[in-house]
């Protein structure tokens, strides 16, 4: 299990298309044996790492658990019971998100820990125990309160950046934050929090924040309908934006913010 191999396995597990006519999802790679082999290898890695590290995957990076969760789920495994440690099932959801084993919690890694912690929780809409250290609402608020003050089109707030603090939104992190918040886009809950950039007390719905972020992303698109992250034009940033848009039901081919002047 590694950053490169897990993402590749995730992509293979999700590679397919949805047929709106018959309502079925067709997998273009349906290698059950390959999935099982990878899950078994990954389980061995998790058990070995837990044993060597005293019950953790990493001392700082909660995303080590989160990446595992989404990969295991994509391949048909159960991240809430994946291998054993000291005779007990390993719950990657609990250990990486709501009872995060990283000292300092998911936020030890910055906004990435909160973003992927929420994505991991919602991979299977896992229930968070009432006595858990980190409730679902906290993940949402921690993301919202780091929204940057670089809004466009009359908005004060824009997107997000990897370090959590800065003056200019990053395409990839903004898109990933939107993906994490997507399940709450149509929820009317108003969240009140202190924005860590402006210092202002803010009361907004997730939808309001996400719409501001989409406006900011649209302003970052270049004349070739591409995006730049870390000073580099790349297809990954385009893919992140497409996933963000579709995660809330927006068609990238019809939203004027993401269509160039020449179409």
Tell where the protein language model's regions lie, with residue ranges.
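Buried hydrophobic core positions in alpha-solenoid tandem helical repeats
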Residues: 42, 46, 96-97, 139, ...
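An alpha-helical repeat/solenoid feature that recognizes helix-turn-helix modules
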Residues: 1-22, 55-81, 103-136, 148-212, ...
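Internal amphipathic alpha-helical repeat/solenoid segments
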Residues: 1-4, 26, 32-59, 96-105
């Amino acid at each position: 299990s590694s950053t490169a191999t897990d993402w590749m396995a995730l992509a293979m597990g999700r590679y397919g298309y949805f047929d709106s006519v018959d309502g079925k999802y067709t997998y273009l790679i349906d290698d059950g044996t390959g999935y099982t082999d990878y899950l078994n290898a990954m389980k061995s890695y998790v058990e070995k790492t837990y044993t060597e590290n005293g019950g953790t995957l990493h001392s700082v990076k909660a995303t080590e658990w989160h990446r595992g969760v989404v990969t295991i789920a994509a391949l048909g495994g159960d991240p809430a019971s994946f291998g054993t440690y000291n005779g007990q099932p390993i719950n990657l959801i609990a250990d990486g998100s709501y009872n995060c084993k990283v000292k300092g919690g998911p936020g030890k890694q910055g906004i990435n820990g909160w973003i992927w912690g929420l994505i991991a929780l919602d991979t299977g809409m896992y229930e968070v125990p009432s006595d858990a250290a980190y409730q679902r609402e906290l993940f949402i608020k921690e993301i919202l309160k780091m929204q940057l003050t670089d809004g466009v089109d009359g908005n004060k707030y824009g997107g997000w950046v990897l370090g959590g603090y800065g003056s200019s939104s990053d395409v990839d992190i903004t898109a990933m934050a939107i993906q994490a918040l997507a399940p709450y886009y149509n929820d009317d809950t108003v969240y009140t929090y202190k924005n860590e950039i402006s210092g202002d007390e803010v009361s907004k719905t997730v939808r309001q924040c996400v719409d501001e972020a989409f406006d900011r992303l649209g302003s970052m698109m270049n004349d070739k309908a591409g995006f730049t992250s870390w000073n580099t034009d790349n297809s990954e940033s385009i893919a992140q934006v497409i996933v963000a848009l579709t995660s809330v039901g927006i068609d990238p081919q019809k939203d004027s913010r993401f269509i160039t002047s020449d179409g």
